[in-house]
Amino acid sequence: MKNNLLTFGTILAIGFFTLTANAQTAQTTSAAAGARLVKPMTITKTADLNFGTINVGTGLIGTVALSTAGTNTYTGGVTAGTIAGTITNAAYNVTGTKNATYVVTLPADNTVTVEESGGTTMKINTFTALSASGATATHTALGADTFKVGATLLVAAGQATGIYAGTFNVSVDYN
């Protein structure tokens, strides 16, 4: 009888472990793999930023805001110059992967200064960009786009007259 119980217990244990092993069978699934390769972007300046000729008052600070459409708005102690001057947006050509969107990075406020030969300076703030493709800068089906940059020139009360010049950086990258 003891042998029968031992044999019965062994059979029962083998059956239990067999059922347990079946409950833990391996499962397999698959995942997609891929990559998107993009062309390096290029940026080429085609025009410089120029606020044109400005008449400066003596007692008031002023601003000259150059829109991305190429028009100036004057406030405070400055008005449009009476001597001919050219108003231009900074303009750029961009190339890259066709139909890809990108972002334009412009200077932060109070980081760009223009200076005249006597050492007097002015700040340029509120840089804005507008792509030819609209609010979201996007390369065409040929992988090209253009954009213009506007900004605001801050003119101090009694600002020294002269020709002011400076530089600023613009960069582009894929979204």
Predicted regions located by residue number:
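Bacterial N-terminal signal peptides that target proteins for export
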Residues: 1-9
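Short, low-complexity polar/charged micro-motifs in intrinsically disordered terminal tails
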Residues: 7, 19, 170-171
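Cleavable N-terminal signal peptides
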Residues: 10-11, 21
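Sec/Tat signal peptide C-region and signal peptidase I cleavage site
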Residues: 17-24
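Serine/threonine-rich, low-complexity intrinsically disordered segments
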Residues: 22, 128-130, 138
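N-terminal small/polar-rich segments of proteins
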Residues: 24-106, 139-175
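Contiguous segments within soluble domain cores/interaction surfaces
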Residues: 94-133
